[in-house]
Amino acid sequence: MSLGQRLALLAIRLQEPQRVASFQRLCGVEVPLGSPKAGEDAETEVRGAPGDPRRRPRQSGADGSPAKPDCCGAPNGVRNGLAAEPGPTGPRRAGSLRRNSLTGEEGELAKVSNLPLYYLFCFGTELGNELFYIIFFPFWIWNLDPFVGRRLVIIWVLVMYLGQCTKDIIRWPRPASPPVIKLEIFYNSEYSMPSTHAMSGTAIPIAMILLTYGRWQYPLIYGLILIPCWSSLVCLSRIYMGMHSILDVIAGFLYTILILIIFYPLVDLIDNFNQTYKYAPLIIIGLHLILGIFSFTLDTWSTSRGDTAEILGSGAGIACGSHAAYNLGISLDPSLHTLPLAIPPLTVTLFGKAILRVVIGMLLVLFVRDIMKKVTIPLACKLFGIPCHDLRQARQHMEVELPYRYITYGTVGFSITFLIPYIFSFIGIS
């Protein structure tokens, strides 16, 4: 057997849903006794891996393309068989915290015997969700180092955009359920390969160490410990949640390393362009909008389209905000002769100002996001003649989802790097 054949066989084995289910059982996640799914696991074991002739073929649309979710939210790949609601003594619904508001799906019933692992992996998977991003990036920009924060956003946008587009090109379904238990359902209508959670969970810690080491004084060993811990936690959490095969996670990790090798040397050039070039805002807005339109043409509706527009809008808004802040002198990076920067001692004043910036800043961010959401969706529906009585259906149109996500999160990003730092400066907590 040649090396290529061995690698192909290994890839097939790593994509088998049975391996995901085995990992879940190892971590204490099982189908509860009496669940309708419990009787289906044995049948699933004989379906085989991708490429195996015994494997049940994926249902296709009328044009031969992979099946997509309908208005009720049938996801890509195999639709989950949801168990009945638990009674007072029934098992916990382990995935209900990530209910998908756009498709109405919820996590499956599962018997979780290891709660510490469950909460650990819930935390790990949140490191790749919007809640984490909307806290993490502003915290860097407001409290730690805007220089590093801006560049982290550039890398994050690049990695996530390429990952989301690659998903819609490859179009591999999520692991079949059964035998896999879907503890999280929020992203189930997206494709699987590669894992963008794994990509984000790899790119952020690596980029964070690359950007800070030598700029800040700290032992390198801290970074060498942080990178594998962060990345492995996020990657394993996606297998634990039943969202990805082992192959998806490995591919996401390796894909991220390749992207960083190619594009990391350009990050400094991109950030300097965003801040200093006279017409940078026009180019930034136009380029990100074109990339968003392109990504929307790769496939029909899924939650990944809105996520892509959200990522691009955030990146464009943060870049434009940094341009305005730089040219108005609101946010200036320390001069090179002051490097490396020493980590200041934690005082009551320093800690108090940091907390104030986080609380005031996040309240303003949430306010801006809520206002823009209420304005952009009805406005887009009115402009393009789309009924807006059912927001779920309306947001499945590109004419609504793209401007809503792009404008809303573009405004949020602009607020993070310009409007909110200006307010901090005005009230004396910058």
Swiss-Prot record:
It holds the Pfam family PAP2. Residues 237-248 are annotated as: Phosphatase sequence motif III. SUPFAM superfamilies: Acid phosphatase/Vanadium-dependent haloperoxidase. Residues 34-100 are annotated as: Disordered. GO terms for molecular function: dihydrosphingosine-1-phosphate phosphatase activity; sphingosine-1-phosphate phosphatase activity. It comes from the Eukaryota. It is found in: Endoplasmic reticulum membrane; Cell membrane. The modification Phosphoserine is found at S101. Keywords: Cell membrane, Endoplasmic reticulum, Hydrolase, Lipid metabolism, Membrane, Phosphoprotein, Transmembrane, Transmembrane helix. Residues 167-175 are annotated as: Phosphatase sequence motif I. GO terms for cellular component: endoplasmic reticulum; endoplasmic reticulum membrane; membrane; plasma membrane. The keyword Coiled coil does not apply. The chain crosses the membrane at residues 121-141, 152-172, 193-213, 216-236, 246-266, 279-299, 311-331, 348-368, 409-429. Specifically dephosphorylates sphingosine 1-phosphate (S1P), dihydro-S1P, and phyto-S1P. Does not act on ceramide 1-phosphate, lysophosphatidic acid or phosphatidic acid. Sphingosine-1-phosphate phosphatase activity is needed for efficient recycling of sphingosine into the sphingolipid synthesis pathway. Regulates the intracellular levels of the bioactive sphingolipid metabolite S1P that regulates diverse biological processes acting both as an extracellular receptor ligand or as an intracellular second messenger. Involved in efficient ceramide synthesis from exogenous sphingoid bases. Belongs to the type 2 lipid phosphate phosphatase family. This is Sphingosine-1-phosphate phosphatase 1.
